[in-house]
Amino acid sequence: MRRTVLGIPAALLLLSSTACSFSTKDPNYVPPEPLPPLEQLKQVPVTEQTSLAAGNDVTAFVTPDRNIVCAMTSARGGHLNVPYEPNSYSDSANNKFAVVPVVHCELAAYPKPEVDDVADDCGGTGLGYLGGTVLLTPDSAVYGSCRSGVTEMEAEFGPKGSKDGPVSQLRELSEGQNIERNGLRCSAYNSGVACGNVSGGVAFFVSREGYQLVSDGGKTVRGSLKELS
């Protein structure tokens, strides 16, 4: 009996010394700065994209915070084949136009376009040049467009969004993952999305805080975010 009583504290001491371990956060640790968009797209491995297919030769995804939706798709004469907005891409009248690979994104919360980045005066359309959309082609990246009202992304996940519609049916691209289609690549990182034509040196980054438009292989950067942080 005496041996049993003495053995219990020893066993408890052994358990307490082996089972309990604590990690403390280094107060001096400084997380690395986010990579520039083109570098992020180059360095992160491409993920499997089959689960993100949205039909009709389109790959589409939303970010985990439901602030950005993107379609890696095609355009004909400015008509985009996207699964979340009405479009006339399939009209036979557009068959005369060349098919161009593009990435189109919409944001629920977004910054205004910088004055120097307004790409259209919207003359004669009765529309305004608004933010909340971005379009990547193999040669350029443009933030904003001529439109009125809200985008589908705003309608579903904006301040008064319904959280129900075509965007809500799309799958997530997880933070830090890359996806590629037709020579264009996208990455969800730094609470936003970067997409680009890596070989052409053209890219963009968008988030609710701001945007970057990158050209000339990273030598030219425009937009409301001069640096990512």
Language-model segments: residues:
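Bacterial N-terminal signal peptides that target proteins for export
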Residues: 1-8
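Hydrophobic helical h-region of N-terminal Sec-dependent signal peptides
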Residues: 9-14
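C-terminal motif of bacterial Sec signal peptides marking the signal peptidase cleavage site
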Residues: 16-19
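Bacterial signal peptide processing site
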Residues: 21-24
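A low-complexity, Ser/Thr/Gly/Pro-enriched, surface-exposed linker/loop concept
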Residues: 28-51, 77, 82-170, 202, ...
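Extracellular glycan-recognition/adhesion modules and their associated mucin-like linkers
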Residues: 53-67, 71-73, 115-116, 175-181
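Extracellular/lumenal glycan-associated surfaces
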Residues: 64-77, 181-201, 225-229
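Extracytosolic low-complexity repeat regions of secreted or lipid-anchored proteins
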Residues: 166, 170-214
